[in-house]
Amino acid sequence: MSLSANISVEAPIENQIQEIAYDGTEIYQLPPTLSEHLAKCATKIDFSKTSSDIDLLQQSIKKEDEKKEEESKDPKEQFQSSLWPWDSVRNKLKEALTEVCVLSDVLNIAKEKRYMVLDPIPQEPPEVKQMVLVYARKKALASAANILQSGVERLKAVQSDQGVSRSNSTDFHIELLRLRRNWRLKKVSNTIIGDLSYRTAGSKFMHPGMFEVTKAEDEESGSPPASPSGSGAAGTVACPKINSALRVNVPTELQGVAFIKVITQKDQEDLCTATVNMMGSTQLVPQAGAWQQTLEYAQNVLFCKELFNQLAREAVQLQAPIPHVVVGNQIRATLLPGIQLIISLCHSTSSDSNNSSEPIKDHDHVLEHSLHQLLREFHHKNTHHPFPHPASGPLGPSKKRMLAGPSAYDRHELLEMTKSQTLLEQIIAQAQHIFTRRRTQYVLDTVARDVKDPMITSHWNAMNSPTMSCVKINITSHGYDANLRTSLVIHVKERSLKCICRDGRIMHMSYEPQELRDLILCQISQHQIVCLQNLAKCMAWQILSSSSHLGIGSVEPLGNASSCVLASPNSDRLIAVQVRCDSQIDVKVFIAQSPAKDFFPGSLVQGRHWEHLGGHFKEVRFDKMEGKNFHNKMEFLMASLTSQS
């Protein structure tokens, strides 16, 4: 029985599918006949190994028989068999059951002839409706499609998870490359360290300005909770809403937003306010990443701290008439009597405090730009030293000092070259100039508003230096511009004014606004008299006398009055004009007639020629005269007094 082989005599339930047509029809492959199956099985037999296999089987049978004999000789087995007396009965019943089963199978085979047929018997195909077949195939295709789609979704999810895990490192290196283009990085051991300081630009600030670059997943897994004080990590300032493969960790003292506020106060009233903030625009660069704004804010904090530290150190070292005061994050310096310059460092680690603060009024962008330029220039001087010319000359002196010998500079010029101003002195000088310029603008505007005749126009030069401005003032009369135009130029400096008149006179004034106002009123008075004289010449009137500083009459509160005396072409009419230098530009006009009608010869004066001395001057009610302005009224008056003869 051990050498018997199992032979399948049953036909397969289904035939193999050879092809499926486009309409869903399945073409089955016919089963092989008995001879084909026998030939196929015969090809699988290796007759070269049959003898060796038989020998191996015989050897294995002998070994089994020997083992059985040894087991039968074992006393333990004998003892156990004695313990089971029904063992022989069980074996006999089992053999009888096997024989009965075999007999039953033989009878069934003999009774049913189909079991003896090796070739399949063709049966009549059952009638199947086409619609049922189509519906069944569609249902089978739909179930197969659902299985395929679910498999595709699972594969897609797996691939996306694997892609994210693989792309994290790729995105990290790409963003690290972008970070390296804009910021200085170096690798120390297993960490990446960046530099925010301005040391390469010439800064000598002691703060290291370092930041650490880490992967996003590393930081998310080990990030500490936010502190109750409101100061979060640097990466959480601008990066929580933007996915990024890397995170930057800046020091605690560089977190948040910082700016420097400069205020000019007079009696607790803000005259000028400016803020220093390097963030010109808070929009992120698309190629940069979520870390760009964080680093810009941190560098802005470092910049403001360096600037304030430099100003505070200079404020302590400078010896001013009124000492500068440094208290905490505030520096107080005196610009002018009663006017203070307050420089404050404002540093906020809360992102909401900056947004909730009210906008600063009267923002001075010029002072803000100047503070930037001063620190940039300070950095530039630390790294850029003038090269000697010729090359064999000493290293260090500037080109101007090298030309001192050939140019024969005196001691005063050499001392001027050695002087240099600190950042605080330059800021104070610029603040003084801004305050003086605002005062000058206010005086010019108020005088132009109060004085209607003549017209005053101011032209400020657009190309100015931080400590000096230039304004040109034109005084003209409406309708008589070609007759006379009085011009004067004023140079506005830090604490003084320099006025250059049309005739070349130069006058120096202090920062007090009243001095400039008095000067303009005097120029208006002289303009009225000079323009009247030019008008009289055009109308053939004679100028008998003229004075820009009349020394007779009552004492004027401001300067001296200007006056002139005019005579008609026939000398029969006289006009005396007096212009006072007050806020209203008071004008008085007197007329006289020659010869005098009330002249009577007497015992003392008997000659008729004395009648040409003129009579008494009578004042004209100038405000009641017709005319647009002073010169128009004087033109009408001279025209009416001119004799027809």
Swiss-Prot record:
Compartment(s) where it occurs, according to its Swiss-Prot or TrEMBL record: Nucleus
Biased composition (Low complexity): 222-234
UniProt subunit comment: Component of the Mediator complex.
Species assigned in the record: Anopheles gambiae (African malaria mosquito)
GO cellular component: core mediator complex; mediator complex
Main location: nucleus
Keywords, ordered alphabetically: Activator, Nucleus, Transcription, Transcription regulation
Record gene name: MED17
Record family assignment: Belongs to the Mediator complex subunit 17 family.
Single GO biological process annotation from the record: regulation of transcription by RNA polymerase II
Name used for this protein in its record: Mediator of RNA polymerase II transcription subunit 17
GO molecular function, one term: transcription coregulator activity
